[in-house]
Amino acid sequence: MAAAASMLRGERVTLRPWTDADLAPFAALNADPEVMLRMSKPLTHAESDAFAARIRSHIAEHGFGLWALEVPGLGFAGFVGLSATVPFELPVPGIVAAPHEIGWRLARSAWGQGYATEGAKLALRYGFEVAKLPQIVSFAAADYLASHAVMRRIGLTLRGEFDHPRLPPDHRSYRHVLYAKDAA
């Protein structure tokens, strides 16, 4: 296990451990149809709380995870961070077995201001420099251009496309793109 990061600070954002005070705004974020448009579905409050519990458990076990994103003036604005492994096979050449994923989900009030990019750069640096990960991947729905732009801005490159195995073929987000970066 890599050393646990208590906080990662950028110029405008902080990635920090979760607190119980984050649960209500996290539930609101996960219930927002705009935020969840490309996910399987909006989450109920109970589903959101269960997801937050899994995130906290992951951080406790691995020393990293999907940290709470704190923005001055907004407070809790979502999450940015790393998952230990992608829980399904990615059928794209050049991807290591059980790769680590970088991801983010932000409240609409935090969209379009560079917070995801700034937070993702902090998480990516932690993943390579502290956790010593060999490769970090990120994927999103093929039509989710804002997420693709963040992936490119943090230095990931397009590696291929795949059909998401956890979504039905008629789901708007069934087709995904995969970006990745290898350790230097």
Which residues does each predicted region cover?
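Conserved GNAT-fold acetyl-CoA-binding loop/helix
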Residues: 34-55, 64-67
